[in-house]
Amino acid sequence: MNKKFWLSLLTVVMVTSLLAACGGGKENNSAGGTSAAGNEGGKEDKVTFTYFNAAAGKDKNTNETTIGKIFEEQTGVNFKMEHLVGDENTKVGTFIASNDYPDVIVPGSSIDKLVGAGSFIPLNDLIDQYGPNIKRVYEPYFNLMKADDGNIYFLPLSAVTGEYTSAPNIEQGAFWVQRRVLKEAGYPKIKTFDEYLTLIREYVKKYPDEGLTGYLSLTTEDKFFAFTNAPMHLAGYPNDGGIIIDMETHQANDYADDDITKRYLQELNQLNAEGLFDKSSFVDNYDQYLAKLSSGKVLGFFDYRWQAGQAMNNLREASNKSGNDDLEYMALPIVYDENTKDQYLDPPSFVNNRGVGISVSAKDPERIVKFFDNLLTDENQILSNWGIKDETYSVDENGRFYRTEEQITQTNTDAFRESFGFKYFEYNWPRYGNGSTLPDGNSVGAGRQPEVAQMSYSEGDKKLLEAYDIASFSQLFSAPDERPWYPAWSIPIDQGSPSQIFTQKKSDLQRKYFPKLVLASPSDFEGVWNEYIGEFNKLDVKQYEELITDEVAKKIANVKGQ
């Protein structure tokens, strides 16, 4: 298939777009915003604030990156960025106990704990006074952002502006398999979990002396959901967290004790008995997990692309040098049963329990809000996502953004992404959410631009796409059904409440029993499962399910403006 054919197909796939749910894509939040010079005249003195991101990463000053230096020139503001080492709850607990915080915090699952402890300042008045761009981007979502007391304590990361554009490639969860496995089998159409595991078993059987790992799991404390979420996806549901929402009744069901969870664990138990499951999955840290994926020895795994991205980028760099993409992975929409519709792709959504907050320790919150506001111009969102014209992206005669092969190779290199600042500024700051478009029709995210997707495909990519008769990798997956509440995991749960205590006890129970269930001899599996269920039944799951059901109903009403 020639380049023109690919581009036309991808353009049809991606230009046909939906207005984002939850008020996304409304005209009132699609204008370009106040100029990047800011909304006040005159330059202020330079200042450095502290910034903590509850995710792994390399500590750095923002002005040590190309993008961050430009932002410092615009605003006089630099941030000393610190990233998480160890356990998030332990780190956040230290902040709370000392009442001494970084100026800016980007929490993960601890965000409810920080809000409950009064760690963040209210932003309402600051937005009114210093945040015209913040208001333009976020105002359609204000009813979803306010706490029970009416205050806004953090700015979420998923406010869609303009029309919603779906991703051509898989950005979220999937069952991944090495390309050489598909090639060896003649590029079969794989849908069920049984077919997926059979594919892996047959490849290992054919190459027994290569030291291959059939299946690997990510189970670190802060990423354990990558292990527990798999049964939900196999049953045909999207990532609502540890809960399934019925499409008709909107009733919530915790599936931790359901057959779909038992079936997944039992399949892994059998893989382990055959020597195909990596036992170290339950003790490896995140870096060790990424190293194993990068090694080329792991045939299959379930995870979210954004968690395994560093390893996948490493593999792409290696294949670019060698010209052989056998060790790269392809995402598959695997489900348990042939007649189940997969739902891996996220519907348009607004995640209102993740974001960026200003702490009570911040000495100059007005200056920080001005910096945030300055980020939210079209000009600076282009800088954060595309970079600098004629250096990291180009523009054709019709005003369409694209990247040359050289620019794509450069901007996909991990070291360059770090030094330029893409790695820091594409996410974890106030931003136009994934799927946003600019007023001129260009995608905010370079990866969702049809021209970039087409040019990014290697010869190996194109061979795979042709083999499966698709124009982009996401076409292998079913379109997402509308879910106004999505994602349910964004529903805030009060610290110390019965529901929060339940989720913590459930998590502790899963961490204790799931390794046992996978590593037990197959003859002992039923006994260990029954022991686990006995302990699970002591927990108050009913009140948790009732809470989520009620909150889902409220979110649906808010989204629909009822």
Provide a role label for each language-model segment:
Residues 2-8, 23-195, 207, 238-244, ...:
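Conserved N-terminal structural module of periplasmic/extracytoplasmic solute-binding proteins
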Residues 5-14, 367:
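Sec-dependent signal peptide hydrophobic core
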Residues 17-21:
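C-terminal motif of bacterial Sec signal peptides marking the signal peptidase cleavage site
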Residues 55-62, 161, 169-176, 183-189, ...:
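Extracytoplasmic/periplasmic substrate-binding proteins
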Residues 102-106, 299-304:
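Paired acidic/hydrophobic, glycine-rich loop segments that form the ligand-binding mouth/hinge
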Residues 119-146, 200-203, 211-250, 300-320, ...:
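Carboxylate/His-rich catalytic cores and anion/metal-binding grooves
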Residues 151, 156-225, 246-301, 356-398:
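Helix-loop-helix "hinge/cap" segment bordering the ligand-binding cleft or interdomain interface
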Residues 383-515:
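Conserved small-residue motifs centered on glycine
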